């Protein structure tokens, strides 16, 4: 690694330690040219997949869009923000576990619906009505039957 002080391309690692949580490595380095010491940290570069929209264009995964979807569906419902944050964390974890560079917006929508079904049945129906573009009452009753069936 290049020296942070003089730019020398060769430095020596004096000490390496794993962080307490195991997520990074701290390295103490010395430059043989200028004899200065500095610390570097090595962490895994984990990125969320790109979202492929239904129209075919791609965009960066935006956790705030997911949070907004939850908050709209859960508006005036008795669900704590802690539970919402945990649900969002589960979605992010699932997306990372997929190990894919791209994921469809449909997959994310289904993940949101699954989490809402766990959190609040009314919020699930609210979200489903917009997400699936319900056109009449029968689609609402179908969604209600679906959620009732899954909770038994």
From Swiss-Prot:
<dbReference type="GO" id="GO:0005524">
    <property type="term" value="F:ATP binding"/>
</dbReference>
<keyword id="KW-0805">Transcription regulation</keyword>
<keyword id="KW-0067">ATP-binding</keyword>
<keyword id="KW-0238">DNA-binding</keyword>
<feature type="domain" description="ATP-cone">
    <location>
        <begin position="49"/>
        <end position="139"/>
    </location>
</feature>
<keyword id="KW-0862">Zinc</keyword>
<dbReference type="Pfam" id="PF22811">
    <property type="entry name" value="Zn_ribbon_NrdR"/>
</dbReference>
<dbReference type="Pfam" id="PF03477">
    <property type="entry name" value="ATP-cone"/>
</dbReference>
<dbReference type="GO" id="GO:0003677">
    <property type="term" value="F:DNA binding"/>
</dbReference>
<protein>
    <recommendedName>
        <fullName>Transcriptional repressor NrdR</fullName>
    </recommendedName>
</protein>
<dbReference type="InterPro" id="IPR003796">
    <property type="entry name" value="RNR_NrdR-like"/>
</dbReference>
<comment type="similarity">
    <text>Belongs to the NrdR family.</text>
</comment>
<dbReference type="InterPro" id="IPR055173">
    <property type="entry name" value="NrdR-like_N"/>
</dbReference>
<keyword id="KW-0547">Nucleotide-binding</keyword>
<dbReference type="InterPro" id="IPR005144">
    <property type="entry name" value="ATP-cone_dom"/>
</dbReference>
<feature type="zinc finger region">
    <location>
        <begin position="3"/>
        <end position="34"/>
    </location>
</feature>
<keyword id="KW-0804">Transcription</keyword>
<keyword id="KW-0678">Repressor</keyword>
<keyword id="KW-0479">Metal-binding</keyword>
<dbReference type="GO" id="GO:0008270">
    <property type="term" value="F:zinc ion binding"/>
</dbReference>
<keyword id="KW-0863">Zinc-finger</keyword>
<comment type="function">
    <text>Negatively regulates transcription of bacterial ribonucleotide reductase nrd genes and operons by binding to NrdR-boxes.</text>
</comment>
<dbReference type="GO" id="GO:0045892">
    <property type="term" value="P:negative regulation of DNA-templated transcription"/>
</dbReference>
